[in-house]
Amino acid sequence: MVTPRSAVPAARPLAARRLASVAWACAALLALVALQCATATKDIVTMHATRNSLIPKDTLTVAVVMIDSYDNRLVFHANKNLLFGASNTSARALAEAYNLLGEVYVTYAYYRWARDDRPVAVGRPAPDYVLGTRLLSGPGSQKIKPPEERPSFPLSGSLRGKSLLMPRKVIFNDPLQTLMPFVFTRYLSITLSGYWDISVNSGKNVFSLCVSSPATPPVEVIATPRSAKLRESRFPQWPRYLYVSSSETSVLVNVAAGTSYKPRLYNATLAGVKAFLEVQNYGSHVAAGQLLTIKQLLKHGCNREPDEPFVVAAALHFGAAWHRFAALAAETYVTDAEILEFVVTTETWAKQVELCFSANAPQLGAAPPASRLAILSGRGGADEGLINVPYAILQVSRERYWGEVRSVNEQLTILTAILGSVDRLGAAAYLPSADGVAPHAFAASIIDSYYHKLIRGSATDKIDRKTLSAAVRVFLARKADSIPTARRVLTHMTVLCSEHQAQNPLVDITGTIDAASGHGEIFCLDDLFTPCAAALRFDLEPQANRPSGNVISASAVYRTLYGSFLYGGSELETAALLDDSARVIAAAQPVGGPKAYADMFFPELARCFDWTRENSIVFYIAISDSASWILTTRPVTGGVRYRLPDTSIRTNLYLTYFNASCSKEPFASRVEKITSGYVNLHGASIACKLCGHALLRYSLGGFEDVFVIRTADEERQMTMGANSSIQYFRAMDPTYFNYILMDSSGSALRVLAFTHGSYAVDKNYIIGIAVGSLAGVFAVAFAARSIYKFYRGRANRYTLLTNDYD
């Protein structure tokens, strides 16, 4: 149990802080020159300020560097008269008055807020089993490769050690001047710039994090060993900063003083500091930060009101994950595959937070805000090799024949390398492999493979979900050259977005995260992927009360944070597990929509559909290379339109066919009546008469799902009923569901039953056949009677004639 000395930030007047920042920056630059000539053996060395009696009274000495027994005096003199004005002038008096008022305000704020201080309990740190195991076992007989050596394939055997990070001595120049400058061994430096500016320094036993934005006060966290005697910049009469410590580490927290006390900010910061001290595994920090992000989304959506407590807590997990990962790499080893997964996951996570939780979050259909993530920028000496690992792996993987890659792990590695390189390389990340297979084709083949497995009810595990998710992201990250392939891929995802796929254990959000956290594994949003996340289905609403309403319990989060689209919704059970039973994504703002996909891959819809009624779209799919079917809740113009019968009075569904001609004839303005008929399921059709047809299923409550028949095997499976290997056909129940059969020419047939008569028989056709047959019977009878009478008449006439001659 540790009691913080004070839970209040220290602040200086704005002008004084700016001047001090300039002074410390200059001192740090000059001190770096001295460090090049000094050799230090300690991890942390303090830098003391001094005053020389020979220096004029109005001159301020900033710093003198002392490293071990070497007394390298580096003096920087600043003239107070130049900085604050000459003595006995109004400018100097005003500056001193501002400074005095600042001291009085901060002292009063400390006194007022310190009454709310509570003990901070820091538990015993949980051991990092990965680090412990590697310290005991070591890399074994495998050689640790230096950064300049190319990684091998598969990546499990390519190990890297301390040379990856290139640790070196640098001066820590505190942006908020919480501590006087000191020297430490830095492993890496991370800078995130955008609406939120976040800087992280990680070194041997030293960690620092600073978070700031235009609308919030800066927050700083500095962790150092308890044995380090570091000087603080506070005035002696001030209480200390927020101070939390464990058995080996002390943490200073500095929040710039604002106009009001923010308990949520302090609570979030304390929780993040406790997690930093208690959790030693980098994967656990990534999992905890992702869970925090998901909770924030489920509660508030992608709001444009900056939530500093959440961002500070997420940033602490982000920085702690990198700090622990750097320690693992420096003290033992990490594999190229681990570097690849960690770098891509944390980069994606940082972009998602910037995209969804900043004041400049994009409006509907707008481009994402500009942001930049720099890892190991090289300032002060950190190697660039870490962020180049994804590209190095991509280069190695291109030498393989992607068309022959069947291992799920290798597929995931290649896809992740592409995702980790696309921001830096752009179109160069989409160059083909040695056998000419481009990333779009590679991703599409993986999606096709999983589609054929999933429609047959095959279960998926974590690696399968991550691979399918990565394939979809690679395919959609840049516009595909082949529009027919893109239409097929999106139709696959729409077919898979059904109630049956919702039974996949993948929707267990908390179970997935807890399993990852408990084993020290990295959790990312790819672990929550469902086909609905990339489906052309837009009826996923929080108010939906139907059997298929739970298909979005995981995909809604994925849709939002991966920049696709979101129309909200989740199971109340899942929301309760996530401590949010009141609001479930209801406030979420979509960052894309049906029109975005139509503009890219469905030109007939982009040109012909009335986009003023975009909100009425339930789903759309491609039925051919140039035609589509779209289901809406309101009638639309521009195509052949049908109203679905037998829905509730509160649910109106309209099915419309669009092709390149954009029908504007008068018939297109009226609603066509869907004829009813029977579909034969007897035997398999060698010609595959149903290929290119779609079967839509709906009930009294609304749309359920859709299936597109593409192959003769799928048509044969349709005939097998409960024995079919395809889940959609096994669940067919015409007594409860209604089915609409749609073809590629714009015709729609309501299926009354599946019989063994003819391929597709309309009831009017049956009546016509019956009437025609009956008429034929009468005609035959009449003809027979006429012939009989004719011949009998001729026979009688012949007899009479014979009698006459006789």
Swiss-Prot record:
<feature type="transmembrane region" description="Helical">
    <location>
        <begin position="765"/>
        <end position="785"/>
    </location>
</feature>
<dbReference type="GO" id="GO:0016020">
    <property type="term" value="C:membrane"/>
</dbReference>
<keyword id="KW-0261">Viral envelope protein</keyword>
<dbReference type="GO" id="GO:0019064">
    <property type="term" value="P:fusion of virus membrane with host plasma membrane"/>
</dbReference>
<keyword id="KW-0732">Signal</keyword>
<keyword id="KW-0812">Transmembrane</keyword>
<comment type="similarity">
    <text>Belongs to the herpesviridae glycoprotein H family.</text>
</comment>
<dbReference type="InterPro" id="IPR038172">
    <property type="entry name" value="Herpes_glycoH_C_sf"/>
</dbReference>
<feature type="topological domain" description="Intravirion">
    <location>
        <begin position="786"/>
        <end position="806"/>
    </location>
</feature>
<comment type="function">
    <text>The heterodimer glycoprotein H-glycoprotein L is required for the fusion of viral and plasma membranes leading to virus entry into the host cell. Following initial binding to host receptor, membrane fusion is mediated by the fusion machinery composed of gB and the heterodimer gH/gL. May also be involved in the fusion between the virion envelope and the outer nuclear membrane during virion morphogenesis.</text>
</comment>
<keyword id="KW-1160">Virus entry into host cell</keyword>
<keyword id="KW-0325">Glycoprotein</keyword>
<feature type="glycosylation site" description="N-linked (GlcNAc...) asparagine; by host">
    <location>
        <position position="723"/>
    </location>
</feature>
<keyword id="KW-1168">Fusion of virus membrane with host membrane</keyword>
<protein>
    <recommendedName>
        <fullName>Envelope glycoprotein H</fullName>
    </recommendedName>
</protein>
<keyword id="KW-0946">Virion</keyword>
<keyword id="KW-1169">Fusion of virus membrane with host cell membrane</keyword>
<dbReference type="GO" id="GO:0019031">
    <property type="term" value="C:viral envelope"/>
</dbReference>
<keyword id="KW-1133">Transmembrane helix</keyword>
<feature type="glycosylation site" description="N-linked (GlcNAc...) asparagine; by host">
    <location>
        <position position="659"/>
    </location>
</feature>
<keyword id="KW-1162">Viral penetration into host cytoplasm</keyword>
<dbReference type="InterPro" id="IPR003493">
    <property type="entry name" value="Herpes_gH"/>
</dbReference>
<keyword id="KW-0730">Sialic acid</keyword>
<feature type="glycosylation site" description="N-linked (GlcNAc...) asparagine; by host">
    <location>
        <position position="267"/>
    </location>
</feature>
<dbReference type="GO" id="GO:0020002">
    <property type="term" value="C:host cell plasma membrane"/>
</dbReference>
<keyword id="KW-1039">Host endosome</keyword>
<feature type="glycosylation site" description="N-linked (GlcNAc...) asparagine; by host">
    <location>
        <position position="88"/>
    </location>
</feature>
<dbReference type="Pfam" id="PF17488">
    <property type="entry name" value="Herpes_glycoH_C"/>
</dbReference>
<feature type="topological domain" description="Virion surface">
    <location>
        <begin position="41"/>
        <end position="764"/>
    </location>
</feature>
<keyword id="KW-1043">Host membrane</keyword>
<comment type="subunit">
    <text>Interacts with glycoprotein L (gL); this interaction is necessary for the correct processing and cell surface expression of gH. The heterodimer gH/gL seems to interact with gB trimers during fusion.</text>
</comment>
<dbReference type="GO" id="GO:0046718">
    <property type="term" value="P:symbiont entry into host cell"/>
</dbReference>
<dbReference type="InterPro" id="IPR035305">
    <property type="entry name" value="Herpes_glycoH_C"/>
</dbReference>
<dbReference type="GO" id="GO:0055036">
    <property type="term" value="C:virion membrane"/>
</dbReference>
<keyword id="KW-0472">Membrane</keyword>
<feature type="signal peptide">
    <location>
        <begin position="1"/>
        <end position="40"/>
    </location>
</feature>
<dbReference type="GO" id="GO:0044175">
    <property type="term" value="C:host cell endosome membrane"/>
</dbReference>
<keyword id="KW-1032">Host cell membrane</keyword>
